[in-house]
Amino acid sequence: MRFENVYIESLGYHLPDNVVTSEDLERRLASLYEKLKLPFGRLEMMSGIRERRFFEKGVFPSQVSSLAGEHALGKTDVDRQHIGCLISGSVCRDFLEPATASIIHHNLKLPTDALVFDISNACLGVLNGMVHVANMIDL
């Protein structure tokens, strides 16, 4: 699918400080690894995952998303008052209702008439949200 009037202006992210590496996990599982005769480094080799990151307990997805949104907005000249839609594509939500996107919308001080909603579809939620907005622009 190709879009004619759509492009990605900016991306933002916010990584948690708590890091647990595959090596850390393997050290914790050392006795099990020995019993099973598994070589050290097996976890990363099999999964391709070098590290995992975790937020502190009590941190809400909207807080992290708002920081990522500010990061993205800080890298562009787009006036936030011209943003007409915000979709939260995360699996994680603050609550069942209201939509997590509504909290992010408030935190980012977007226009009151901007469309806001959540799309949750595992790893594809973000991509689904991007395609949905692109269709709203181009179709």
Predicted regions and their residues:
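Short beta-strand segments
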Residues: 9-12, 89, 120
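Conserved catalytic cysteine-centered active-site region
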Residues: 41-46, 50-62, 91-139
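Short glycine-rich or small-residue beta-strand-to-loop segments that form or flank ligand, phosphate
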Residues: 85-91
